[in-house]
Curated annotation (Swiss-Prot):
InterPro entries xref list: GAMMA_CORONA_M, M_CoV
Functional description taken from the UniProt entry: Component of the viral envelope that plays a central role in virus morphogenesis and assembly via its interactions with other viral proteins.
Location relative to the cell: Virion membrane; Host Golgi apparatus membrane
Name of the gene encoding the protein in the UniProt record: M
Name listed for the protein in its UniProt record: Membrane protein
Intravirion side: 42-51, 99-225
GO MF term list: structural constituent of virion
Membership in a protein family: Belongs to the gammacoronaviruses M protein family.
Membrane-spanning segments: 21-41, 52-72, 78-98
Membrane topology term: Multi-pass membrane protein
């Protein structure tokens, strides 16, 4: 008699297993649906943070499952596939951390570790406050607005400020570049009391260099002139 135990589930056992855990599966799928549908920085920030945590957990989970697949492969072909996928997951995870650390070194913002974006926008207000926001790519134009005393850019709430707090230049940093945007147009309302309620600013991409935001912040008052 063979001492090996067959651990394969048949159809009836699979159905029973699903019936036993269907409530957990339903709740888990609903959680993922809410996270993916509403997890945007421009919508509900709390759900967006949960989404980032889920994405951060996926890479270590993939690596762990890949290692288990390498230890217990179904056959030789499965072992080769498991090794390839695990190595790819490890390289991708390491590459993410390298790029994120390079971006953090350039802009000093925790948005650098956002797994959904490759760039971080920075607005250094004239009152000394620094506003950072995640941005998916480097645009040609940025248009921050002030509405009811609150600064928004790319649809994201940044800070409370006044129209005269906006600087001459703002920045979008990537892992290897600093993109400089120069203010080319602004509208700060009329004389009927709207000046402090709404303002629009247009910044066009002017130049690209390899500097860091820290060098700009400590470079004197020329930034705000």
């Amino acid at each position: 008699m063979s001492n090996e135990t067959n651990c394969t589930l048949d159809f009836e056992q699979s159905v029973e297993l699903f019936k036993e855990y269907n409530l957990f599966i339903t709740a888990f799928l609903l959680f993922l649906t809410i996270i993916l549908q509403y997890g945007y920085a421009t919508r509900i920030r709390f759900i967006y943070i949960l989404k980032m945590i889920v994405l951060w957990c996926f890479w270590p989970l993939n690596i762990a499952v890949g290692v288990i697949s390498c230890i217990y492969p179904p056959n030789t072909g499965g072992l080769v596939a498991a090794i390839i996928l695990t190595v790819f997951a490890c390289l991708s995870f390491v590459g993410y951390w390298i790029q994120s650390c390079r971006l953090f070194k350039r802009c000093r913002s925790w948005w650098s570790f956002n797994p959904e974006s490759n760039a971080v926008g920075s607005i250094l207000l004239t009152n000394g406050q620094q506003c950072n926001f995640a941005i998916e790519s480097v645009p040609m134009v940025l248009a921050p607005i002030i509405k009811n005393g609150v600064l928004y850019c790319e649809g994201q709430w940044l800070a409370k400020c006044e129209p005269d707090h906006l600087p001459k230049d703002i920045f979008v940093c990537t892992a290897d570049r600093r993109n400089i945007y120069r203010m080319v147009q602004k509208y700060t309302g009329d004389q009927s009391g709207n000046k402090k309620r709404f303002a629009t600013f247009v910044y066009a991409k002017q130049s690209v260099d390899t500097g860091e935001l820290e060098s700009v912040a400590t470079g004197g008052s020329s930034l705000y002139t």
